[in-house]
């Protein structure tokens, strides 16, 4: 997820959308200003705004798989809200590509953001279990600025081509890799 963007509902987000960081990540704005000042002084300041990472060894994927197998998913926010992510492989590719890019700010995410419900249901389907229950959307507000930040709908656009257009395509690859490593047996991959 792109934690500093505001909740934009169904609207597309690009790098020109003003940031609204929460208390815990407001230093992102300072970091981006530093990159801009570096560029103004003749350097090549590059900012990559990553989505939520996923990969075979990602702790959040391991935890989410365990939760979904247990019938629930601790992802706050409205089920229809968008969720932007990026595979570890595509994130690495974006970093390498940035070495050749001009100064600027770039979203580094999958080409197609998924709605939270679609993200969770398709992962449950790949695991061969029923769709998980999720906490009601309003519960995120009980966790203050962090909860509200995590519940935002962020349908972000991406300028680079990804190996996996969305988590829907990337997930089977990471689940197969997990299975090959014997990290977590999988019932079915679709």
What residue spans do the PLM features occupy?
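Active-site segment of SDR-like NAD(P)-dependent oxidoreductases
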Residues: 1-4, 51-54
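Mid/C-terminal beta-alpha module of Rossmann-like enzyme folds, strongest
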Residues: 92-146, 186-189
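Short, amphipathic alpha-helical "lid/cap" segments that border enzyme active or binding sites
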Residues: 88-96, 175-179
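Catalytic helix-loop patch of NAD(P)-dependent Rossmann-fold dehydrogenases
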Residues: 3, 7-47
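A conserved pocket-lining segment of Rossmann-fold NAD(P)-dependent short-chain dehydrogenase/reductase
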Residues: 18, 63-86
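Conserved loop-to-helix N-cap of the C-terminal "lid" that shapes the substrate pocket in Rossmann-like
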Residues: 47, 57, 79-92, 105, ...
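Glycine/proline-rich active-site loop of Rossmann-fold NAD(P)-dependent oxidoreductases
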Residues: 8-9, 28-29, 41-43, 54-64, ...
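C-terminal amphipathic/interface module of NAD(P)-dependent oxidoreductases
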Residues: 147-190
């Amino acid at each position: 997820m792109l934690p500093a963007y505001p909740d934009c509902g169904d609207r597309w987000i690009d790098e020109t959308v003003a940031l609204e960081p929460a208390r815990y990540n407001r230093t992102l704005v300072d970091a981006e200003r530093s990159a801009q000042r570096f560029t103004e002084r003749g350097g090549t300041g590059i900012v990559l705004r990553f989505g939520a990472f996923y990969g075979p060894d990602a702790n959040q994927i391991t935890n989410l798989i365990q939760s979904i197998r247990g019938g629930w998913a601790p992802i706050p926010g409205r089920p229809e809200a968008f969720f932007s992510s990026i595979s570890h492989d595509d994130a690495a590719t974006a970093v390498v590509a940035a070495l050749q890019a001009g100064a600027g700010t770039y979203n580094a995410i999958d080409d197609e953001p998924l709605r939270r419900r679609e993200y969770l249901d398709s992962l449950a389907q790949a695991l061969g279990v029923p769709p998980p229950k999720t906490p009601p959307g309003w519960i995120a507000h009980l966790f203050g600025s962090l909860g509200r930040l995590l519940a935002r709908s962020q349908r972000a656009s991406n300028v680079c081509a990804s190996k996996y257009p969305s988590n829907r395509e990337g997930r089977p690859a990471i689940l197969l890799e997990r299975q090959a490593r014997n990290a977590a047996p999988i019932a079915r991959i679709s």
